[in-house]
């Protein structure tokens, strides 16, 4: 407990696997359909869909921005990139899971390209802030792109280089976004799913830099 107590003081420090909370085997129970569009939340989907995973701060606002895009079939919020299996929201907020808040996006590539989703991602938040996003501070708010295919990984890295060049022109700092192969996504509790559609006056800390990714 000494090690965990020390980490709790500084939520900008990722715990090791040994320090992380143990979690549980049982995943969160989720509704069958998306609250906004009525599509299946987790499938079955048609064979032409693809999957993308983004973390850009608090997942409430991030999910709304992504479900608003034409061609997006479903969105699910969850936790990824850490050690604790099937964590609770409170556990993630403790800083003792190493997870960040993410949105799993199910999309039709003939209607919206992965590059277009990357443009939404970069422009919707500030990817230079490390373990925070605006006033939201902690490892669970770090910026990430978790890629489900090698093609996505190449595209994400290329877009990061493009956006970094634009940030420098604007006098902004270095991108801290993690760009990696997709780890396991543990879905968040049902009340977090499509939260801002259920609670239109709810908190949304999403905010970009004003810098645009070239088309």
UniProtKB/Swiss-Prot annotation:
Gene3D superfamilies: Peptide methionine sulphoxide reductase MsrA
Record keyword Lipid metabolism present: no
GO CC list: cytoplasm
TM regions (residue ranges): none
Database matches in SUPFAM superfamilies: Peptide methionine sulfoxide reductase (SSF55068)
Chemical reaction(s) catalysed: L-methionyl-[protein] + [thioredoxin]-disulfide + H2O = L-methionyl-(S)-S-oxide-[protein] + [thioredoxin]-dithiol; [thioredoxin]-disulfide + L-methionine + H2O = L-methionine (S)-S-oxide + [thioredoxin]-dithiol
InterPro entries to which the protein is assigned, alphabetical: Met_Sox_Rdtase_MsrA_dom, Met_Sox_Rdtase_MsrA_sf, MsrA_MetSO_reductase
Active site residues per record: 58
Coiled-coil intervals: none
Enzyme Commission number: 1.8.4.11
Disulphide-bonded residues: none
GO molecular function: L-methionine-(S)-S-oxide reductase activity; peptide-methionine (S)-S-oxide reductase activity
Entry keywords, A to Z: Oxidoreductase
BP GO terms, sorted: cellular response to oxidative stress; protein modification process
Transmembrane in keyword set: no
Function noted in UniProt: Has an important function as a repair enzyme for proteins that have been inactivated by oxidation. Catalyzes the reversible oxidation-reduction of methionine sulfoxide in proteins to methionine.
Family as reported in the entry's similarity comment: Belongs to the MsrA Met sulfoxide reductase family.
Protein name (Swiss-Prot/TrEMBL): Peptide methionine sulfoxide reductase MsrA
Species of provenance: Pseudomonas savastanoi pv. phaseolicola (strain 1448A / Race 6)
